[in-house]
């Protein structure tokens, strides 16, 4: 593809306004149409990146049967606790919460994040059955357990996760079964599965137009006057305002982004077998279970990442490639 005649910017306007995300926990706005009963997402923490050697299993590839170098991301997966159940009704204005029920025993650390419901005010499971006919969606409220990881904090993150299934009654029965229990990553996903990753990206702060939008650096008299990295024109005399489409300096990074169709290469329960010598940079050792995802995942180390079942997965023609080697060499340059 040749150079465009007009290229006012490199970035997409679809992501505007490019401002900081309100919360570190990403919003999940869509879910896969999965008839399998179970959770459709799982929150994890990003530990770091390394590389692996995979055996190419595409018969049409020139590297078929050979080892191929690929970057991989390691995510720590401490068990999550199911704290509550919430039912929704579909209305003309979107989903409307009908009722919610909380577990009898709640973790004290959850009180650092939410105002816990008093014991005498808690609803029973009968409140769920009373509105079952109206309900169209069943979700569970889960919280992470960061105190079991190397991340220096006790306050958990709270995520609302949809339960998949063919009927509402079937989903509700599963939700009642897991209420108050802890779930592992192996209860939701398995090796070889295609997933989406949702997270808040690395924050870059206030950046100029060249870095933020990829505009052209001006030379000649513009550079001599010290305005080589400025926007050439910010618009005409009329209308007497600057349009929102003009590439201007501002916030870069710390936005919510979704990356689609990532493959899970490996699931494990012993973090020591995946931790590199000296630990991951800015993270340390993996103390719980882990998941290895092919490619990169947005966000810095220690960032919460939500793994969701793929909403637009294509046909998986070749399946899970054989993992010949995962590097655990030091990432500190030693």
From Swiss-Prot:
GO biological process: translation
Subunit structure as annotated in this protein's UniProt entry: Part of the 50S ribosomal subunit. Forms a cluster with proteins L14 and L24e.
One GO cellular component term: cytosolic large ribosomal subunit
Family note: Belongs to the universal ribosomal protein uL3 family.
MF (Gene Ontology): rRNA binding; structural constituent of ribosome
Region (Disordered): 1-20
Classification via Pfam families: Ribosomal_L3 (PF00297)
InterPro entries: L3_arc_euk, Ribosomal_L3_dom_3_arc_sf, Ribosomal_uL3, Ribosomal_uL3_arc, Ribosomal_uL3_CS, Transl_B-barrel_sf
Basic residues: bias regions: 1-10
Protein name according to UniProt: Large ribosomal subunit protein uL3
PROSITE patterns per UniProt: RIBOSOMAL_L3
Keywords: Ribonucleoprotein, Ribosomal protein, RNA-binding, rRNA-binding
Function of the protein: One of the primary rRNA binding proteins, it binds directly near the 3'-end of the 23S rRNA, where it nucleates assembly of the 50S subunit.
């Amino acid at each position: 593809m040749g150079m465009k005649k007009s290229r006012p910017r490199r970035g997409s306007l679809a992501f505007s306004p490019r401002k900081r995300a309100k919360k570190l926990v990403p919003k999940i706005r869509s879910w896969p149409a999965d008839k399998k009963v179970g959770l459709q997402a799982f929150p994890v923490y990003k530990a770091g990146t390394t590389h692996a050697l995979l055996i190419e299993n595409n018969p049409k590839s020139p590297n078929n049967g050979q080892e191929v170098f690929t970057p991989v991301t390691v995510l720590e997966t401490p068990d999550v606790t199911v704290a509550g159940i919430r039912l929704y009704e579909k209305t003309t204005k979107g989903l409307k919460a009908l009722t919610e029920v909380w577990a009898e025993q709640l973790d004290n650390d959850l009180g650092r994040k939410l105002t816990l419901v008093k014991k005498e005010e808690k609803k029973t499971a009968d409140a769920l059955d009373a509105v079952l006919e109206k309900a169209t969606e069943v979700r569970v409220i889960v919280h992470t357990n960061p105190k079991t990881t190397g991340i220096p904090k006790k306050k958990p993150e709270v995520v609302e996760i949809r339960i998949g299934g063919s009927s509402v009654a079937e989903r509700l029965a599963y939700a009642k079964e897991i209420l108050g229990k802890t779930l592992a990553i192996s209860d939701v996903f398995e090796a070889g599965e295609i997933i989406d990753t949702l997270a808040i990206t690395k924050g870059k702060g206030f950046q100029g137009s060249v870095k933020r939008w990829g505009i052209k650096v001006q030379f000649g008299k513009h550079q001599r006057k010290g305005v080589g990295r400025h926007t050439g024109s910010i618009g005409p005399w009329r209308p007497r305002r600057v349009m929102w489409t003009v590439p201007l300096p501002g916030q870069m990074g710390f936005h919510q982004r979704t990356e689609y169709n990532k493959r899970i290469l490996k699931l494990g329960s012993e973090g020591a077998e995946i931790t590199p010598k000296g630990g991951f940079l800015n993270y340390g050792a993996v103390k719980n279970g882990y998941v290895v995802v092919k490619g990169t995942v947005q966000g810095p180390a220690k960032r919460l990442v939500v793994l969701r079942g793929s909403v637009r997965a294509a046909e998986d023609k070749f399946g899970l490639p054989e993992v010949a080697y995962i590097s655990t060499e030091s990432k500190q340059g030693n």
